[in-house]
Amino acid sequence: LRGNQVHQGSKMLKSSFLVIQVMFRRWKRRKMQLQVKAAVTLQRAFREWHLRKRAKEEKSAIVIQSWYRMHKQLQKYAYVRACVVIIQKRFRCFQAQKLYKRRKESILTIQKYYRAYLKGKIERTNYLQKRAAAIQLQAAFRRLKAHRLRRQIRAACVIQSYWRMRQDRVRFLNHRKIIIKLQAHVRKHQQLQKYKKMKKAAVVIQTRFQAYIFARKVLASYQKTRSAVILLQSAYRGMQARKMYIQIPTSVIKIQPYYRAYVSKKEFLSLKNATIKLQSIVKMKQTRKQYLHLRATAVFIQQHYRSKKLAAQKREEYMQMRESCIKLQAFVRGYLVRKQMRLQRKAVISLQSYYRMRKARQCYLKMYKVVIIIQNYYHSYKAQVNQRKNFLQVKKAATCLQAAYRGYKVRQLIKQQSIAAVKIQSAFRGYSKRVRYQSVLQSIIKIQRWYRAYKTLSDIRTHFLKTKAAVISLQSAYRGWKVRKQIRREHQAAMKIQSAFRMAKAQKQFRLFKTAALVIQQHLRAWSTGRKQHMQYIELRHPVLMLQSMWKGKTLRRRLQRQHKCAVIIQSYYRMHVQQKKWKTMKKAALLIQKYYRAYSIGREQHHLYLETKAAVVTLQSAYRGMKVRKRIKDCKKAAVTIQSKYRAYKTKKKYAAYRSSAIIIQRWYRGIKITNHQYKEYHSLKKTVIKIQAVYRGIRIRRHIQHMHRAATFIKAMFKMHQSRIRYHTMRKAAIVIQVRYRAYYQGKMQRENYLKILRAVNVLQANFRGVRLRRTLRNLQIAATVIQSNYRRYREQTYFNKLKKITKTVQQRYRAVKERNILFQRYNKLRHSVIYIQAVFRGMKARRHLKTMHLAATLIQRRFRTLMMRRRFLSLKKTAIWIQRKYRAHLCTKHHLQFLLLQNAAIKIQSSYRRWMIRKRMREMHRAATFIQATFRMHRVHRRYQALKQASAMIQQQYQANRAAKLQRQHYLRQRHSAVILQAAFRGMKTRRHLKSMHSSAVRIQSRFRSLLVRRRFISLKKAAIFIQRKYRATICAKHKLHQFLKLRKAAITIQSSYRRLMVKKKLQEVHRAAVLIQATFRMHRTYLTFQTWKHASILIQQHYRTYRASKLQRENYTKQWRSAVIIQAAYRGMKARQLLREKHKAAVIIQSTYRMYRQYCLYQNLQWATKIIQEKYRANKKKHKALQHNELKKAETCVQASFQDMNIKKLIQEQHQTSIIIQKHCKAFKIKKHYLHLREPVVSIQRRYRKLTAVHTQAVICIQSYYRGFKVRRDIQNMHLAATRIQSFYRMHRAKVDYQTKKTAIVVIQNYYRLYVRVKTERRNFLAVQKSVRTIQAAFRGMKVRQKLKNVSQEKIAAIVNRSALYCYGSKAQCEAVGSEGVIIQEWYKASCFACSQEAEYRSQSRAAVTIQKAFRRMITRKLDTRKCAALRIQFFLQMAVYRRRRANFVQQKRAAVTLQHYFRMWQTRKQFLLYRKAAVVLQNHYRAFLSGKHQRQVYLQIRSSVIIIQARIKGFIQKRKFQ
């Protein structure tokens, strides 16, 4: 009846909960719709207000910009003009100084060469004389040096012998000293060891002797005390024996009835308990066998089915990924080949252009040299022919012609340079704008990607928290028909398994109820028979125990009343607790059942609908998916619009701040300009007149300076001619004097020579003989010494050469061997590493399998042998800790090599490990549940036995209550198991689907990212090709070679990246299929580290090369800008405006391209999801509201386009005004052009242009190098961020795992503490009981002593003394014993007198003794009852605590699971947010740097244009003035 009532109540609760949930969901849906509508209206209002505000701000900014530009241009004009005046002054001064220096240098060189000739002649004579003297001195010095060397060698030999002897002696003395010291230390150590041994022996002897003396003393004292103790013991034992003799008959009479009742009761209860125990064990074993068989079959079916499904699914995924990888590889290789062909063609074209340029340059140089030579000859001829009179007129005419010619030449040059500069500027601006657009586009795409990821995460999280069924349905609707098909199959299989399992459970429950009914019937029959026997026994005993039962009945009734009241209170509280618990569990179960029932009912309805109307469902799904895709596109657009609006707001705010500061500055300057505006015309006229006067004055000053220089040159020539003639005269005179002196000396010398020769011949004969003898001797000695020296020197040279060769060969051999050994060791290490990793993987798999087997065996052993549970649990905990430590250590080793691994692989490994851990925890939880269930049943059985043994009267009630309670517990346990099984199945299915969807999503994201990067790369390459096509005419052979080298390196890097990517994909698939992740990860890490090292090395070399080329080009550029500062024209500003206008148009076109690209990307996704292609158009036509929204967006875009066109129109007006002013200036300038000089000066201008193009090409190359370096830096930074994120995830995961371990340990400690506290409590209660028992015994002893005293009262004192003396003498034979007994007898007499004194109060004492007896009996019964109640309460509390701990563990597990899920969600949100912020910061920084660079560059270009235009105007005006003067 109670089960039916509970079932009806649960049904009512289910229905009420269903109604409440439906109403709550409707209310929540309505609330969400209202919130969405309100948000949409607010967004529209905010955007309209923002657009209006932006239009106003742009108008104000345009006005401020126009004023600010005008002010900046005026300021720059004044500065440029001052600089031009200074440059002209310095240039003219430099020209005059140059002419003067040339002439002075020519004069000085002539003087220098002549003086050098004279000095050389004199020095030659001196040199010959000195040479002869030096030869003689050298011969003498060498002789003396050889003699000294011989002596030194002999002395060195003697010194070396003495030194070696001394060294040997010193070594010998040192060795002797060391040996003596060592011998001394060894002897000292030996003596110390001997001394320590002797000291130890002495100490041992002393301690033994002292111990012997102390033992003798202790033995003597011990014998004395022993004799005294023996006397006391004998006296006490005699007294105790007398007491026992009196107590035994009384206690025997009392114990006999109690013992007989106890024995009969015990036999009856033992038989009853044995029968109950046997029945319960037999039934438990039967049910256990059935349950295990059903469980094994269900697990085997589930595992087989899941493995089969997983294998099929993995095979399909692997084939898809393989096909996509093959397609990508083919596409990339074809693209690389095409790119190489294009680059080779470009290199050939650049070589041809360089060769033609070189040929033209050689022709131009030849012509230029010829022209210069002709001009020089012509000027010299004119200077010679013309007279001094016509010199001034000719000079004036020449200066006028030169000025006009130079002005024309400069104008032509500037014009061509301006055209080239305009082209280069337009190309560079286009390139810079394209780069900027690409960076902005990439940043927008990244922001959109991250925002979409965040949006999808938040949507998934909200849907998941609402209802699991809704999440599953939405995921299945979103992610494809394959997942739904798989889920349906799994659902059908699960339904079958659940139905089979529920059938088995229902049968099991029916059998349990049946056995419980039989047990209750047996208990009732046994109780009725026992009751009858007990009544008969009571009727027989009734007349004997009437008197006792009267008092006992009275006390028992009181006690029963109290116990009944207490029991009523306890039962009420207990029922309240049970009902509350039931209600809570029923509520939770009802909620869960409602959830799962709804999920089941929805799934069933969907299944029926699917079977009935498949085509309709497909159409609805496709329509829904199309709607979802469009909705997502719309959301993405909205998100992009919001991001763009925020970014533009930030940009406009920043611009507004800058404009405001510039507006304040402009206002200040504008007030000054307004004041000086009316004086501007007067100042302009004055300026023109001043410039004219300055030009005339400078011309006059230069002409005067040239005249002065001409005069000085003529004077220097005359002086030089005079000096030359004077030098010639002096030389002739000196030569004549020298000839006279030499002739006279020659004649006198001839006479003396003849006399001298006669004497000399005789002396020579004598000297020759003497010298011959001496020379022969010295030659012999020298020859001997030379041979010795040569042999020694050759020996030394050969020895040094041999030593060098030996060292080199040794080093080469060592290095070669080291390299060889290194290679061998590396190969061995790789082999060992691979084998070790493979063995580790196999060993880990074996360990895991072994662990699972041991766990299964442990579960069976726990069920069979409960006594070994604790030891087994300890063993398993130790084993688990060892495995955990091993995993930690292996994880630590893996993390060292896993620093640069991808985040997705980390996530996959983490999911696998968490799944394995979850499976192990699940098994342990099931084991723990089984163990707790066994413990609970065993404790319940034990409590039942004790309770029946203590009290028979309440046996029937307790049996019924326990049977009811057991049924409820089994029902609850069944419901819990069913609930947990359903939860686990649902969690497993959800986990499986999530894992599959995650893998699909990750693979799709990877393919998309690779494809997007490929598309971006293609677009970038196309733009780069356009830039290269524009720049290819300006490049030289060095640039082409450099580009080829760079291309080869880039191709190598691309090939390595592709190969690494292919290896990664293949390894990942093998990891998923074969589960050999450890081996693949290790090889991939090694390969990737090597690749990264190679790429970094190549990148560093490239960066260094680029940086060096950039530095060289920068230096060339600086030299070039110094030489060609006047190469920019006013037209550059206009063309720059034109280029900006074109860039705006290109930007619009890029926006259209971006939209088309997005459309194309969505179309690709649409093609990939083929099932959604048929019904998008139908739903698109039907969904007119969305079309209206899109039309509204298009109108908004049109409004923005109109505003932009209006702004462009204003800008065009300003440009047209500037263009008109430039055209007027050009008209005035073009009047002075001459066509003949244009053809003559065309070739040098072309060469200048080519040089300029080379420099610009170098500059663009440096910019490309910087961009590539920055991209590499960006990639490295992304890798570092990914690595940091991976380390943070790992640390978080380790923290979570440590936390889980800590919580499990904490719960185990709490359980142990509870057990220990119960044990302490039982111990204290036992102690209290023993203390009470002791006190009762003391009271009994006192009462018995009083009884003895009453008996001894009638005997005379003399008889008592005689009896005492006789007994004492009989017991103790010696006098000493008699004295001791006498003292004890005195004590007994005193005690007896005290007892006699107490007999006077006999009446009071009797009443007190009776009361004491009754109190004792009542107290004993009360203690026994209290102990029984306490034991029962303790057992109940223990049971309830165990259940509460179990519930708490389950609640903690659920909470931990929820907390883990929330933590993962928050961590992912934090990670995505952080990465988004990092990317946003990087994008903002890049944009700021790029804007600053563009603004500086633009200002520099404007400044150079204005400066060049001012210089040109001044030069042309001067040329015009000179021409007018000349005419």
From Swiss-Prot:
Keyword Mitochondrion attached: no
Q: Which GO terms describe its cellular component?
A: cytoplasm; nucleus; spindle
Q: Which GO terms describe its molecular function?
A: calmodulin binding
Instruction: Look up the coiled coil feature and give its residue ranges.
Output: none
Intracellular or extracellular location(s)? Cytoplasm; Cytoplasm, Cytoskeleton, Spindle; Nucleus
- UniProt KW keywords: Calmodulin-binding, Cell cycle, Cell division, Cytoplasm, Cytoskeleton, Mitosis, Nucleus, Repeat
InterPro entries xrefs: CellDiv_DevSignal_Domain (IPR052318), IQ_motif_EF-hand-BS (IPR000048), P-loop_NTPase (IPR027417)
A Pfam family annotated for this chain is: IQ
One GO biological process from the UniProt record? cell division
What are the IQ domain coordinates in residue numbering? Answer: 35-66, 175-206, 225-254, 248-277, 321-350, 344-375, 394-423, 417-446, 467-496, 490-521, 563-594, 613-642, 636-667, 686-717, 709-740, 759-790, 832-863, 855-886, 904-935, 927-958, 977-1006, 1000-1031, 1050-1081, 1123-1154, 1259-1288, 1282-1313, 1332-1361, 1408-1439, 1456-1487, 1506-1527
The record's section on SUPFAM superfamilies has: P-loop containing nucleoside triphosphate hydrolases
What does this protein's UniProt record list under function?
Answer: Probable role in mitotic spindle regulation and coordination of mitotic processes. May have a preferential role in regulating neurogenesis.
Q: PANTHER family this protein is in?
A: ABNORMAL SPINDLE-LIKE MICROCEPHALY-ASSOCIATED PROTEIN, MYOSIN MOTOR DOMAIN-CONTAINING PROTEIN
Record-given protein name: Abnormal spindle-like microcephaly-associated protein homolog
Coding gene? Answer: ASPM
